[in-house]
C-alpha cells in the first residue's frame, strides 16, 4: 500500500516514522556487517531488492474501487531476515515515490512500517517456524512467508487508516471496513505472489545453493541433495 502525501495527518506520519526507525537503523547495521563478512551475498540481495521493486509496482484495481498490489517482501525476508528487508523495502519505496510517483514522502514512514517492517517480520517468523520443523521444503515455506507478508502488510495498512479516520469514533469499525475492502483482491494476490516467490526461491536454491547455506536458509544436506541431482 502506497500512501500518498497528505493522506494521513502529519501526527500519524511522524508516529509511524518513529516506530519504523529502529528497525531501519538496525537493518542498515545488519547489511553492513553481512557485506563485510561476505560480499558474495550482494548479488542475491540485489535480486531480492529488484523483486520487491518490480512486484510491488503491479497495481490491480479492486471491485470496491481501491487498488491492491503484491509486496514482494516475503522472498527477501526468508533469505535475509526482516531487518535487511526493511532497508531494501525503504529504498524501493523512496525510488518509487521519487521516480514513479507511487506513494509520498510525508507518509513514507507509515508505508515503510506496514510494507517494509511488519510484513517482512511476520514472513520471517512464519518461514523460520516452518523450516525448524524439518518437514517443510524451501519452496512451500517461502510460499507461506510471502502470503503472510502480503496479508499482514494490508492488515497494518487497515489499522493505520482506521486510527487516522475512525468511523463514527470507532477504530474497530473503520479497521474492519478497510480490511474487508482490501481482502476482496488482496487474498488472491497474496496466493499468486506466494506461488511466484516459492518458485523463485526453489530456482535460486538450485543454481546458488552454497549462498543460501551460508545464510542459514538451507542445510548442508539440502545442498548435497541439490548438487547430486545436478551431477
From Swiss-Prot:
In the bilayer, the protein is annotated as: Multi-pass membrane protein
GO cellular component terms, alphabetically, are: ATP-binding cassette (ABC) transporter complex
Question: Which stretch is the leader sequence?
Answer: none
For this protein, the parts annotated as crossing the membrane are 6-26, 41-61, 79-99, 107-127, 136-156, 172-192
| Pathway assigned to this chain's UniProt record | Cofactor biosynthesis; adenosylcobalamin biosynthesis
Keywords in alphabetical order, please.
Cell membrane, Cobalamin biosynthesis, Cobalt, Cobalt transport, Ion transport, Membrane, Transmembrane, Transmembrane helix, Transport
- Location within or outside the cell: Cell membrane
Task: List GO BP terms, alphabetically.
Answer: cobalamin biosynthetic process
GO terms, molecular function:
cobalt ion transmembrane transporter activity
Pfam families, A to Z: CbiM
> How is the quaternary structure described?
Forms an energy-coupling factor (ECF) transporter complex composed of an ATP-binding protein (A component, CbiO), a transmembrane protein (T component, CbiQ) and 2 possible substrate-capture proteins (S components, CbiM and CbiN) of unknown stoichimetry.
**Family as reported in the entry's similarity comment:** Belongs to the CbiM family.
Q: Please describe what this protein does.
A: Part of the energy-coupling factor (ECF) transporter complex CbiMNOQ involved in cobalt import.
Q: Which PANTHER family match?
A: COBALT TRANSPORT PROTEIN CBIM, PTHR43627
Q: Which HAMAP family match?
A: CbiM
What protein is this chain from?
A: Putative cobalt transport protein CbiM 1
Organism field: Methanocorpusculum labreanum (strain ATCC 43576 / DSM 4855 / Z)
Q: Which gene encodes it?
A: cbiM1
